[in-house]
Structures are given as structure tokens and as C-alpha cells.
Amino acid sequence: MNDVSILVIDFKDHELTRRSIEKTLTQFSPKDIIVISDRDFFPGSKFVEAHPTNGWYEYNYLLHNCANYINTSHVLYMHWDSWAVNKNLWTNEFLKYDYIGSPWYFMPPEQAVGGGGFSIRSRKLIETLANDEFISNIDPSQKNPEDSFICLTIKTYLSEFKKIKFAPLAVAENFSFETLAPKNETFGFHGAYGMVKYLNYDEFVYYITTKMTFDDSATRIFTGDFWRFAILAIYELQKVDFLPFARYATSKLNDENFYKLKYNLELNRQLYDFFFN
């Protein structure tokens, strides 16, 4: 058992988040499972009831002010579309750092760690985010997305003045991946590419159709980054059996959003040809 708690904050995707925790537990043994939600959807977890009404602002506040519920040195923070996949790649070296996230290859190496949707955060970092006067005085509008706020906006301050240690890119590449094919196998993942890589067709359909049912975000899923990276993964991994579902799903979009998807794919001609031809 590791000195690590699984932490999830979820108010919309209870069933999918429950499944993601279950998948992670086949690969990793945490000391605690902390669920901050409006519903106690994971029996045996440490349930913290909350009912946010102010969207991402309150969500970020809960994430950065949860130290009182944590009895371990670190948390493994997860979303509904992230989980651990390779127990053999866990190493206690991860716990030498206050923050590890999925690599951002669109950033220079010194700023590339990284995505928060599957991340390790130390209690020290969480307490700093909650209690530091300088951070507290920053306008909340600058704190979203919260992982960019931590890893880009205030990274220098955290590193130099608070001695927060961010994992180097080489370590993060063994920990997780998010938007592109990983250079090697990883302990876990976050996002569409990993879902295509690790779920079979029926599971993928279940996750996406359930997300559409319980969250009014079909437009975001099928026209935004999630679907773009899913199609990229389908193409690269040669999982062509996903193509009928992709066409079915996009057929449910209205004309405006359908053309948004086509525009996104036109940014990469290979993906466009694969998807529409």
C-alpha cells in the first residue's frame, strides 16, 4: 500500500468516474479514496459532500482546498476519462515530486509537465495553493484551467519561493500521457487517446454515450479536443472498427456543429481523408 490517496471531484459523471476508479484499483493500491461530490457513488470511499453552483471557479476552489481530507503525503488526482493501466510502471520515484502530470508536447520541455487530469500532487502543494497569500490574491479568472495555472502561471513562484518540485519531462513520460501517442508505455493516462488505446469498442461506446446522456456536452465532445484526439488515435492505432460509430455519432450533430468537426479535421488532411472518405 502506498502513502497515496486517490482523489476525485465529480458532479456530473458519477458512473464513469466510478468505473475509472475501479480500473485504477486493478493496477494500484491507494491508502484512501477521497470522493468530493454531490453523491456518494463509490462505497468505502471517504465521501465529502459538496454542491457547487459556480462552475469551474468552485470546482478549482474545492481541488485546491482539500488538504483537510488528505491523510497521505500525495494524492493521485483523476477524472472520468483517466485511470492507471500498468502497475509495473509505478515507482516510488514519483513521490519525490510535488507535481507530476501528463506531458504537454506543445510546450518547451521546461514547461511541459503537465496535464492535471491524471496527476500526482503532494499535500504540500495543495496546502500551499490554499494558504499562500500571494496565490490567494490572484484573480480567480486567471486560475482556469487549474493545471495551467499551477504549471505555467505560478510555476516559477512555486519552484523558487515555495520549493515545490515539479517532475522533469523524462519522469512524466513514464507516468502518463494525454494528447498524443506516448513515446513508451506509461503508468496511466488521461483523455481520448488513452481511451481508444485501452478500451474495446463496446466500452468506448458505453463511455461516450453515457457522457452524452448525463452531460449536455455532446457538442464539446464531438467538436473539441476530445474527439479530435480520439480520431487521431483511431487513425494511428488502426482501430478502424471505430469508424462506423464515429460516423453515427457525428450524424447526430446539427449542421453547425457537424461543420465545426469537419473544420477541426481539415487541420490534418490525413485525418479528414480517413474520416470522410
Predicted regions and their residues:
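TPR/TPR-like alpha-solenoid helical repeat scaffolds
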Residues: 258-277
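Generic structural signal for small/hydrophobic residues in well-ordered secondary structure
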Residues: 33, 80-81, 122
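Alpha-helical junction/boundary sensor with strong preference for TPR arrays
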Residues: 237, 252-257
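Short beta-strand-to-loop acidic/aromatic patch adjacent to the donor-nucleotide binding site
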Residues: 72-83
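Alpha-helical repeat scaffolds
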Residues: 241-252
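N-terminal anchoring/stem segment of glycosyltransferases
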Residues: 1-74, 257
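Conserved donor-nucleotide/metal-binding helix-loop-beta segment in metal-dependent transferases, i.e.
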Residues: 83-113
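Catalytic core and acceptor-binding pocket of nucleotide-sugar-dependent glycosyltransferases
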Residues: 113-229, 235-237
